Amino acid sequence: FAENMSKVPVVGQLAQVLTFRSFEGTEGDVELNVNVPVVKGPDGKELPAKVNARIQQLTADYEAQAEKEMAEYKESFFQTGGTKEEWADRTMDLYIDYDVKYLSNDVLSLGVTTAKSWVSADEEHTYYNIDLKNDKELTLQDVLGDDYAAICNKSIVSQIEERMAADANASFF
């Protein structure tokens, strides 16, 4: 849905998505590349502020968890005989960014990506879909109707079939 909606041209929105915090650098053993968004919504609407609070909490928690994991790993590394010279090669890369998938006077679809890599890697995507006019979060049911699950399943199966026809080695999980 968001991918298709992102292709629609938009002029004169009532809402904006701006970079609230941007940082690139090193803090301790963590290499950071962080861009945190803030939603500036239509006056009198509460949901953009709630979404901003959730985004701030999500990114703060993710950064804190990454720092905690790195500190625990560092402690274990030295407790098991690792040296400072060996440790010098170890860092964690932490990445936080956002992407406006769709924005009009009525709807905002925003994705926030959080990722870290070091011994292992993980990446998470969190999406916020806002009905700006009615000040509520949009669900698939709101957009597609009561039969949204069947519509989604049909679309997914169709996309898998198309990709498999184009590439016999494609795999899906």
Task: Please state what every model-predicted region is.
Residues A2-F173:
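Compositionally biased intrinsically disordered regions enriched in Thr/Gly
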